[in-house]
Amino acid sequence: MDFDKYIRVIDDFPKPGISFKDITTLLKDGEAYRAAVDAIVERVRESQPDLIVGPEARGFLLGAPVAYALGIGFVPVRKPGKLPGKTVSETYELEYGSDTLEVHADAIQPGQRIAIVDDLLATGGTTSATARLIEKTGAQVAGMSFLIELGFLEGRKRLEGYEVFSLIKY
């Protein structure tokens, strides 16, 4: 399937010079959404993960159905203050400031193999922080899969040493 044709491109959003890749047009098409999830499932299956981790918020839209298809659990990675229990956190630098990601402290066990699934690989900052967060728990990152990769932002360089898969590349 030509997944690219299901991605709406919105120029100058959220600011001038940005070409936004809108996945909602793929999500609303049942056949395309299922085919995209199935393609990611086949790639993730190869890494034999124990769990799928998806960063907030669009990582939930792909990570949860991938976990379901594989018959394994899904663990959400959230922004600070969104999880009710004890958490493990990782702070990372943004272009102008910093951000933090959290996961429940008991969600991931040492030695588990974890696959990260998200909608977009841009600069790699969020995914790199997610990987560090997983590794803080004593687990291993088994691979990373994305619906879209913006290759010109070179996020893959930041993820050297990890298996990275992208369904659509711009």
From Swiss-Prot:
Subcellular location: Cytoplasm
GO annotations of cellular component type: cytoplasm
Keywords, comma-separated and alphabetical: Cytoplasm, Glycosyltransferase, Purine salvage, Transferase
Main localisation: cytoplasm
Catalytic activity: AMP + diphosphate = 5-phospho-alpha-D-ribose 1-diphosphate + adenine
InterPro entries: Ade_phspho_trans, PRibTrfase_dom, PRTase-like, UPRTase/APRTase
UniProt-recorded Gene Ontology molecular function terms: adenine binding; adenine phosphoribosyltransferase activity; AMP binding
CDD domains: PRTases_typeI
Full protein name: Adenine phosphoribosyltransferase
Species the sequence originates in: Desulfitobacterium hafniense (strain DSM 10664 / DCB-2)
Gene expressing this chain: apt
